[in-house]
Amino acid sequence: MRSEQISGSSLNPSCRFSSAYSPVTRQRKDMSR
């Protein structure tokens, strides 16, 4: 789980955007898997 958050932060330079897309990113990664 920690790796996921780090990856998202690294991919998204905008911390605020990442926070708002936190639930969307998690679902996207789950679907991709």
UniProtKB/Swiss-Prot annotation:
Signal peptide: none annotated. The keyword Calcium does not apply. Residues 1-25 have a biased composition (Polar residues). Residues 1-33 are annotated as: Disordered. Keywords: Leader peptide. GO terms for biological process: transcriptional attenuation. The keyword Acetylation does not apply. The rhoL-rho operon is regulated via attenuation by Rho-dependent terminators within the sequence coding for the RhoL leader peptide. It has not been determined if translation of rhoL is required for this Rho-dependent termination to function. This is rho operon leader peptide. It comes from Escherichia coli (strain K12). The gene is rhoL.
